[in-house]
Amino acid sequence: MLRLCFFISFMCLVKSDTDETCPSFTRLSFHSAVVGTGLSVRLMLYTQRDQTCAQIINSTALGSLNVTKKTTFIIHGFRPTGSPPVWIEELVQSLISVQEMNVVVVDWNRGATTVIYPHASSKTRQVASILKEFIDQMLVKGASLDNIYMIGVSLGAHIAGFVGESYEGKLGRVTGLDPAGPLFNGRPPEERLDPSDALFVDVIHSDTDALGYKEALGHIDFYPNGGLDQPGCPKTIFGGIKYFKCDHQMSVYLYLASLQNNCSITAYPCDSYRDYRNGKCVSCGAGQIVPCPRVGYYADSWKEYLWDRDPPMTKAFFDTAETKPYCMYHYFVDIVSWNKSVRRGFITIKLRGEDGNITESKIDHEPSAFEKYHQVSLLARFNRDLDKVAEISLLFSTGSVVGPKYKLRVLQMKLRSLAHPDRPHLCRYDLVLMENVETSFQPILCSQQQM
C-alpha cells in the first residue's frame, strides 16, 4: 500500500486529445484524477473487419458483434493519471491476429481515474453489473457463456471475477493479470477473483510484494521470477515512475509475448520458487507424459491435466529475460563426481554455438553436495537458444574467498534440453574442474545407454 501511495504522488499531467475520427479510449487529465470522476463505462468493439477503428456498443445495440464467435473482454484497472493503458492497442491487435473473435475493450476510465485508490476499487461491482447486463443481451441473441473470455488487469481481474460469479462460474475463461492486492488481500472468495468464477481461471502474479495479490486465485497461478522483482525493472526509487509500475505491468507484457509467437514461455508446476530454482520441479516436459503449462493465451491447453488433480489447482514458476520476448531456455546439467570427500559449491555454465553465439547461465541454486558416484541434476536457464552446441565451459566455485582452492573431479557431465527434448544429449567424461577456473571442452554425443 505504501508503494501505491508513492506511485500516485509521481503522476504528472496528461493532455487531452479528443479530435479523432474513430472512437478511442477515454483520455483524461491528471486534474480529473485529483477532482475525481463519476463512473461511465464504454464498450468498444474490435473485429477482424474493424481492427483499428472501434465501434461503441451497449446492451441495447450490439453492433457488428458476432455472437457465434468467441468474445474476449479486456478490462483495465486503476488509472491514477487518466491516461489510456499503453498496452491496450497492442493487446487488441495481438488477440485478433491469433484468432477471429470479437474483442471488447471495457473503458471505465471515468471511474478508474482518481488519485484515491479506494474510490476506484469501490466501483468494481458496478462495472461488473454493467457487463452482466451486456452479456445477458448477448445470450438473448444466441451467445454461449463458455465462448466468453475475460482478461482483467489489476482491479480488472476482480471485475472479471465478479462477472463470472454472477453466472455461477459458467464463463469459459478468466485470465487475471497481476490482480490488485491492496484492499483485496485476505478477502473471502466472493469478494475477489477465485477459481469458481469460470470454467478455467489462470493468473499471472508479477508484483506480489506491492500492487499485486500474492496468494493463488485461479486453477493455475503463474509466478514469473517468483512473482517479485522482475528483470529489467528498476530496483530503486531513482528509477522514477517505472519503479512503481514496471513489476505490475510485466504480467501484461508476458501475456502479450505469448500472442506474438517469438517464443513459447513455459512454466513448471511446483510448491515454491525455491524448489523450482533447485531443479526439483520437472514433472512435466522432457521425458514426461505431461507437457509443461504455457504462460499466457495458451494456458488453457493445460486444463485437462488440472482436472486429474484434487483440487484442480496448481502454482507454476518460471524465470524471464530482461527484454522481449522474455523467454528463458531450460537445460538440465547432470554431474556425477568421484571426489573421495563431499564437495559443496556452485556451477556456472557457458555454451557456444556453431555460429559463434555465446550464452551463459549462473545456475542459481543452493550449494550442491557433490558426492562420489552420486548424480546431481542442476537446472540451468539461458536467454538464448543454441540449436547446435560446439563448446561448453564450466566453472566450479565453493563461494569461499579464503581457504584452500578445491577440485571437482567429474566422472560424467550430461547436458539435456527441457525445451527441446528431441535434441541429442551432450556429454563429457573424466574432467577435473579447478575452483574458480573456467574449463572449456567440446562435448560429444552421450552413449545410447545414458540417454
From Swiss-Prot:
Tissue expression remark: Expressed in placenta and colon. Weakly expressed in small intestine.
Catalysis performed (reactions): 1-hexadecanoyl-2-(9Z-octadecenoyl)-sn-glycero-3-phosphate + H2O = 2-(9Z-octadecenoyl)-sn-glycero-3-phosphate + hexadecanoate + H(+)
Organism per entry: Mus musculus
Keyword field contains Glycoprotein: yes
Disulphide connectivity of cysteines: C233-C246, C270-C281, C284-C292, C427-C446
Subunit structure: Interacts with TTMP/C3orf52.
Protein known as: Lipase member H
Enzyme Commission number(s): 3.1.1.-
Membrane topology type: Peripheral membrane protein
Record key words, sorted: Cell membrane, Disulfide bond, Glycoprotein, Hydrolase, Lipid degradation, Lipid metabolism, Membrane, Secreted, Signal
